[in-house]
Amino acid sequence: MAIKDYIRERFFPHIWCPGCGHGTVLNSLLRAVSQLGMSKNEIVVVSGIGCSSRISGYVDFHTLHTLHGRALAFATGVKLSRPELNLIVPMGDGDALAIGGNHFIHAARRNIDLTAIVMNNRIYGMTGGQYSPLSGHGILATTAPYTNIDYAFDTVKLATAAGASFVARGTTYHVQQLAKILKQAILHEGFSVVEVLTQCPTYFGRKNRLGTAADMMEQYKNNTTPIGSKAKQENPDLIERGVFVQKEIPEYCSEYDKIIERAMKGN
């Protein structure tokens, strides 16, 4: 199917600001789905609240637009009741790791077959530019006018430590790599986490004087490197991108079905 066949054109134009990276993430996701040849009826997109969560309204799949931070909880329920469906959960950095942080670590621990896309623009964009758990030390935000003193989570390390069986990172600059990673994540049986570094030129960019959206994307080009590269050895401050974890361990829903079968047999 063509990419346009996967969207609800009646809801366009979208609400995202000019230069926002979320449209690039959506495009990469739809290209991944298209390349996999997936039917619209075998995909469920579950989102919470925030700029990133508007994706569920734009895609012509089964969709749920749920509560702030609870997308993974809703997605867990859908997956347990309809395990044959492919669950994709786009979340913002606050949605996933602030109010939704508890659900995130337990979904990873259980290894539920969901694809969690953490769209990290380092800010709460929809509600006015407050800092998030991924904003980082020293940045400016509406709730940190004299700089933020919190240090950021490392999403990759957090997901890995919590037990996710697929963990990756991409950026809105490296779109071909991002689409490839998303394909791998969707095909993986288990909890997949894909962090996407995506720009918010309106709140994060202006507040921190980072220039235009193109300037911010240029930073992803210059400040990231493939996993294990020589550049990383020479400059430890570079952010690695690629697939960090990909392992096969028992998937939660499959194991749960075994328990149900045992219970019905009475042993």
Give names to the regions the model predicted.
Residues 49-125:
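Thiamine diphosphate
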Residues 1, 11-12, 199-267:
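Flexible, low-complexity linker and terminal segments
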Residues 49-51, 121-123, 174, 197-203, ...:
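Glycine-rich beta-alpha junction loops
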